[in-house]
């Protein structure tokens, strides 16, 4: 079986003008490959996905899009370590400062690495330094890893991703994140807050990483709950309750005029302190001398010798650098809009492996390709496989079909054939199943029944990580108006139960679960307070009225609608409701007709007006009537 091989003249772009060849912007050219064979609306997707990629320790991709030099020239490098260019003959020197461990807007690490050595000759346009996401001036924000498109025990269902533990242990997708925390000193009625190391009721072991001023030392290791900046706030002892004063006497502690208001490391933090910025403002306090010389005395005079410097509230920014390894729940993506969540990390010995013994790094779902019509990822992994065994790198234009029909397919197959011929590995290209390989199960070393598409793909790690998403709450702050838990992870909020979620629970008939979620777990103030007591005393848990329903009643009353809740007693009864345990003496039908019914309704409404306050009741009685 023969394959059409693209000649080098097809990929020789020097014969044509770069303006005629450049269809996309330089930014988009760095991302998209094989655009011609994609769905026409799909090329916009990877552009947004790659903006959220996290800089890891990256290798250069095996192949990247062709970007023409006319639009890719590096004109200047202004960036943290100092370069000095010049010789003894030329005494003028130019210095560029390179950034080291600088925080980005996405809390990732920005760093510049020198690309030249001392003594190298550089000219205009030469690269001086690489960033955290480039190698040799080319975009490199991911890793070349072995990818297999096959189902595996349902763990890659619905765009889930199965990865090899090698990616975790060898820090292939380990990234550095820098977070900034701020603390300020304010002026209170009792005086200024102070940044200090002397914090009341704190042992020496808890402040051993603080310096003399009460700020964590640069390079110190901090974990959850550790003090980052020691701060005390003036406190009025008179505001203590008698119970609190009694506790001080029981534990033989002196009443302190200050309280601890230090900045502590938040939940889940394990990081190093890398930088501290202190911002303070001072002003001159003018002291005046005044003499009373009687009527017509001059205004008081300012004396420069007695003017003093007064410190204003200061701001302290502390930066923590944290290493994050790949874990279950993190998000990964390719360069073709193919993204997913890590569902399981398998041991190396359980992963499928190639005929030469190389274990697969990532297992993707093959159903994610045909429906989205991003076939370019298949071409990418096959060309990457050929480039791995040939030791080559490729520049691929996004619209290469102009050079012939099936130009991309022909070029990929030709490179696979060349790799098979040079290495002698016949499994790289099977004439009966081109582009597919026989894989072996790592658990029992048996061959899979069907051939599998395997290749080398360039996979990225995105900024959407499970450490920033995971959240749980038992109790916490509530809204003042609706008495419902707040929303959001930053506010220690609760899980939102929307309208459609309520419908889903109703559809399964989980009545008691739904009643708890809408009352004591949400905004039933009385039920929340009595829940623990009823559980201890083994009593029935009573469900009260949601506070949001009471707010709705009040809002309707503000619109001049006479809506209220009434108490059930012998004198009054609620219209339209049948009393439990009693026979209905009135025939209230759908049209509410009849003279007798109208008279009784008028009598009931008159009785309600006469008894205004005693007849207001709780909502649970109304629910019983309903």
Swiss-Prot record:
Keywords of this protein's UniProt record, alphabetized?
Chloroplast, DNA-directed RNA polymerase, Nucleotidyltransferase, Plastid, Transcription, Transferase
Known Gene3D superfamilies for this protein?
2.40.50.100, 2.40.50.150, DNA-directed RNA polymerase, subunit 2, domain 6, RNA polymerase alpha subunit dimerisation domain
GO CC annotations on file? chloroplast; DNA-directed RNA polymerase complex; mitochondrion
Locations listed in the record: Plastid, Chloroplast
Q: What EC number(s) does this enzyme carry?
A: 2.7.7.6
Q: Name the chemical reaction catalysed here.
A: RNA(n) + a ribonucleoside 5'-triphosphate = RNA(n+1) + diphosphate
What processes in GO biological process is this protein linked to?
A: DNA-templated transcription
Chief place where the protein resides: plastid
Cited InterPro entries: DNA-dir_RNA_pol_su2, DNA-dir_RNAP_su2_dom, DNA-dir_RNAP_su2_hyb_sf, RNA_pol_bsu_CS, RNA_pol_Rpb2_7, RNA_pol_RPB2_OB-fold
One function term, GO molecular function aspect:
DNA-directed RNA polymerase activity
Question: According to the UniProt record, what class of enzyme is this?
Answer: transferase
Location of region: Disordered: 287-307
Q: Family assignment?
A: Belongs to the RNA polymerase beta chain family.
Function per UniProt: DNA-dependent RNA polymerase catalyzes the transcription of DNA into RNA using the four ribonucleoside triphosphates as substrates.
Q: Which PANTHER family match?
A: DNA-DIRECTED RNA POLYMERASE I SUBUNIT 2 (PTHR20856)
Give the quaternary structure: In plastids the minimal PEP RNA polymerase catalytic core is composed of four subunits: alpha, beta, beta', and beta''. When a (nuclear-encoded) sigma factor is associated with the core the holoenzyme is formed, which can initiate transcription.
Please share what else the UniProt entry notes about this protein: In C.reinhardtii the gene for this protein is split in two.
Q: What is this protein called?
A: DNA-directed RNA polymerase subunit beta C-terminal section
